[in-house]
Each structure stands twice: as structure tokens, then as C-alpha cells.
Amino acid sequence: MKVLFINKFLDKEAIYRDPLGIMILAAVIRPKHKVFVIEPVREDVQKKMDEIQPDVIAYSLRTGYHRYYIDLNLKLKKKYKFVSIFGGPHVTFYPNVINEEGVDTICQGEADEAFAEFIDVLEQGGDITRVKNFWVKTQTGIIKNEKRPLNSNLDSIPFPDREIFDDYEEVCIAKVHSFIASRGCPFRCTYCFNDGMSKSYEGQKYVRRRSVDNVIKELKIVKEKYDLKIAIFEDDTFNLSRKWLKEFCEKFSKLNLKLLPIGVRAELIDEEQVQWLKKANCVSLIFGLESGNEKMRREVLFRNITDEKMIECARLLRKHGIGFATENILAIPTSTLDHDIETLALNLKCKPLYGGAKLMQPYPGTMMYNITVRMGLFKEKDFDVLTDFTASSNLEIDNRLERENLQRLFAIVIRFPFLFRHIRFLIKLRLKPLYAILHEIFKAYIGIKFMPYRRSLREYYVVFRRFIFSRESNIFFQMDGRNKDAICGSSSSIKETSVPKKELPVLLEDSQIVPKKYTKPLKSSQIADDVVATDFDSGER
């Protein structure tokens, strides 16, 4: 069968980040089927569709970008015949997507085995309504299948098929590529999808790791084929297992590569771990600071780590010459502008190379989603106008202008600390477009320092071109997070024609349990009582 993946993998937020999900799914089906990809913002979708004539089109949905793909799929359905498959985190936690016109099937949870089985059964003319993980829309209703058990042996999964992107210079010219060595996270942060995902697989081993040798083998292959210089690891908690980390660092150090893990837990870091990372030529890493207020971290975000531990982690990294960036969340429910400025102040004490700040977004499946709905701060319909969580928030928040300006100035103030004394004045100015431009320029500059290797002029040009053409998340479209035209991309040029369609009844059923919202706002102490954190087994330590 001809299977087409449509994905905006040239999104500027994903520069130097490979679309591993698509690559893995391509790897599991490519031995039997033909695989194609389309980047809908850069390419003429209609022309590519006419050339490929796919049997299946697959989309991976993230909350905030889901509407783009649903609308694009509907336009394609009016001109072409194919089976549409929607997967990804948004579908896993918000399966009512199946009710959307043009959506034929959804795939929930980890899709490696399920996707391959579905494509095989479809080609053979079998019963696709019996494939686990899939919900299928039929003439008589929606067939809902349970999820299959998690694959406990990650070494059995084929290496990501990077060759399907060889025609895209933006992906293959860089000497930086993404890898993942584990799946799952034992922590239960209220804003993270891992809490909801782990509960949906209750009773199973959610945190799993590839063997070190399996990871090293993949690294060697990519280094030989793509002249790899820096390996980015996208694990949720890269330093969870001390035993695994020590072995990995020892073997990685022999590859003559640079290491950049983007999911490090500060509370697990000690000097011994930092020494291992340094030996492995770790040039930079990212850890979540999230909030500069301990009570907010502990009671609202369920991040039980002290300011002192954050500062100590930063001190150890600086001592051993490892650059680092922090991730931060602004506009947390029950927080004030003062709390957000505390977050900036703690970053100034930690002195990261870059401090990324995002505005809180309540994603389906997270505890934060239930909290914000219950407080009346968020309505489900707001998902459809949510676009870029780095630029805006759909929560009902106080001091919106100041907080959105703070988000854009956050990293710049960390780099130029003298601005901190003027921050309250600066964030009151109606200069959001200017701040957005300054932030993106600064971010590009820091990115070069954060991933140090010798780039060719051609690579600089290609990366710049990728940045400019990422229209849906470009700074010029960040001025209004609800700009519908900005999300439509080149798909708007698709000409609609009438084709015979089956009349399929839609089952309107709420699969998302949403508590009743409170009539009064919750205090942070109430939230801690309202949502119970679960214990976890961190595995081999």
C-alpha cells in the first residue's frame, strides 16, 4: 500500500529535531509498503497528492496544532479517496476527534505495532475494526478497541527510517540528529502528558529503556551515513537510571561525538553524574526549572525540588563546563505576575545559557487540564483556536499583556541581567511584536552556541530558509495566537471537488471525564488536596 505521512516537520520549533515518530512508523511498515511524506507548508499538497495517489494518509496530532490537520484532511477528502488515520498525544487523550468529518480512524497510545498491523490488515482486505489501539468509524457507529499491552522490549523496534527525509535538505544537511533511548517517565507532574499516559497503561511497566549497545549501534549508523556531530537525546528523563547512564557515557565517549540530552531531571543530578556526562563530551543539556516559587512547584506542578537543589545543579554544570538551558512555565493557575518574576529571578541565580519560557497550556489527559476546567479558566472549545503555546495562552489569566511580554523577554533578561531592574516597566509596554522579533533573533544566536560545531555556509542558509518558511509558528504570526489564516498553510489552495461519500452516523459521546468546575477559584493548597500524586518506581538507580 502507499502510505503518506503529512506533517509540518519543518516547524521552526523543531529545527535540529528529527520527526522520530514518523521515522519509526515508517520503519515498521516500509519492508512491505511504500512510504511518502509531505511537508504541507513548504510543498504544493495538491500536486504531491496527484503524484502519489496514497491509499492511506496518517497524521500525528498535538494539541494546538490539531485543527490544522483536521481541516486539511477534510479538504483532501473532498477531492481524493483514501483512509485517514489520526494518532498522536491529542488523539490519545481526546478521542472525540473521531467525530470530526473526514476522520476515518484514530490510533491511541504507542502505535508501533498497532499501525503496522492496521496497514497489513487493510491491504489484505481484513477486518480493520478489530485492530487494537484503533477506533474505526463505520456505517453503523464507531468501533472502539482497547489498547494492546506496551512493548517492554524497545530493542525490538526498528531504528527510525531517516532515509524517507533524504530529499529534504533541511533535515539531512545538519550534523545534529535526534535519538531516544527510553520511553515513559515515573514522575507525575500535573502539566505533563506522562501522568495520563501511564494511568492509561496502569499495571504495566511504563518506563522502559533500550539497551546501551542498541543505542550505540544506531548512533554509529547515523554517524557514518549523515556525518553526525551532535546527538540530541529526547528522553523524558535521560538521567533516571544511574547504572544505564554510567554505561552509556562510557561507551558514548568512544564515538567522538557531542552529547545533548534535553530531558534531564535536576533533582537527580549529582557531581558523579555530571562527571560521567562530561566524559561523554556532553556540551549542553536542558532541565526543567518550571517555577521560581517552591510552593507553586510543589503544590501545583508536583515538582518536589528546592531552589537550593536547582542552584546546586546549575553550579555543578558550570563547574564542569557543561552548558545548560532551563524550561519555565509562566501564568500557572493560582499564580500571580510576581510568581513569574520570581521564576526569572531564580533563573538569574542559576545563570543558564538560555531560559525558555512558555505560557501554561492545559493539555488533555493532564491533571492541569482538569484543574483549569474545574476553575473555569479553560473551555474545551478553546482547543480549536489554540496555536502556539510559546506565544499565547488560552487560559483566563490576569496581567495577560505583562505575562506575554515577559515570555518574550525572559531569555534576553537572563543574558543581560541589568534589565531585570527594569522588567516591570518593560513588560507594560505595548511592544509585543518587537519583543517577539528580538526573542527569535536571540534564540537563533544562542542556538549556535548551545550546539557548537562547525557549520557550512550552505547549512546556515538552509536553516535560515527553514526558519523563514515555518509560517505557522513564524514570529510574524505570533502577534495573534488565534490567526486562523496562519494555520491554514498552503493547503488553502486545494480545490474542492465533489466525490461520493458514505453517510456515516457520528456517535457523540464524552470520553473525557471533566470534573464540575468550582464556583470560586482554587487556592494552590486546595489543588494539592484535590489531585493525588502517585508513587513511582524509578527502576534501576
Predicted feature descriptions by range:
Residues K12-E13, P95, F187, K295, ...:
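Flexible glycine/acidic-rich beta-alpha junction loops that bind and position SAM and/or redox cofactors
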Residues R62, H90, E234-S241, V264-A266, ...:
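Short, solvent-exposed turn/loop segments enriched in Gly/Ser/Thr/Pro and often Arg
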Residues D155, F159-A325, A345:
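Radical SAM [4Fe-4S] cluster-binding motif and immediate context
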Residues L10-L20, L61-H66:
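A short, glycine/small-residue-rich beta-strand->loop->alpha-helix junction that serves as a flexible
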Residues K2-I6, I15, K34, Q46-D50, ...:
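Radical SAM enzyme core and accessory elements
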Residues G102-V103, K278-S284, K351-P352:
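Glycine-enriched alpha-helix->loop->beta-strand junction motifs that scaffold or abut catalytic
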Residues P95-E100, T334-L348:
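Catalytic cores of alpha/beta
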Residues K2, L25-L150, L359-G365, L504:
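Glycine-rich beta-alpha loop elements in corrinoid/cobalamin-binding modules
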